[in-house]
Amino acid sequence: YLFAYFTGNNITQEAIRFALSDDGLVYKALNNDQPIISSAAISNTGGVRDPHILRGNDGLYYMVATDMVSANGWNSNRGIVLLKSSDLTNWTSAKINFPTTFPTQFGSVDRVWAPQTIYDASVGKYMVYMSIRKGSSDYDKVYYAYANSTFTGLEAAPQLLFDNSGLSTIDADIIEKDGQFHLFFKTEGNGNGIKKAVSNSLTSGYVLLDKYLDQNSNAVEGGCVFRLYNTDDYVLMYDVYSSGYYEFTKSQD
């Protein structure tokens, strides 16, 4: 199991690191816990956060991250970074500034957070989804767009994927099981825990399951769900960010 992560809010910590695990639960940092690629070389801001990595159907590796330095303020980021590799060592990268690229739809954005990628088999494309806020009068919602064939940009302006009825939603993570798509997310500023919505379609129709799924009374974020190899167990991991550790929970459904 490969875990992509960043370590904190200092600019030296806002960089992509890797860790490995044999069991999906206990991880060992690689490269002496140092970044595997320079944030300054791949981003507009000089820092990257919230990395997510996907092994594609084509055998390549796709990674996305928030282009942000938190010292500039939590409402300061305007885009994301896309990366692609065949060997997990050598990466090509591209930056997307949303106000510049999509001025009509996203000219006023002040948060483009926690992008992730999933393969949409129905169209044979990689879908990138993230939370976006269009300025201080808006709240965070989940949007999606398809990456272009070279994974250097988006085919079109992102479309709305999930709106939690006026409540901010960040850190979306989608997994498919038995033909259904489960969208896990953080209830940002309104409970600060992990809930999910479910749909029969990847790109529409998500219905909220209105209960918290994390097993912690503290605020958590950055949820990620994956299946343990050769088992029926699924792990929901999340960042107990006020206490500086990750927690892992298991489920079979």
Residue ranges and their predicted role:
Residues 1-253:
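Carbohydrate-active catalytic/glycan-binding domains of CAZyme proteins
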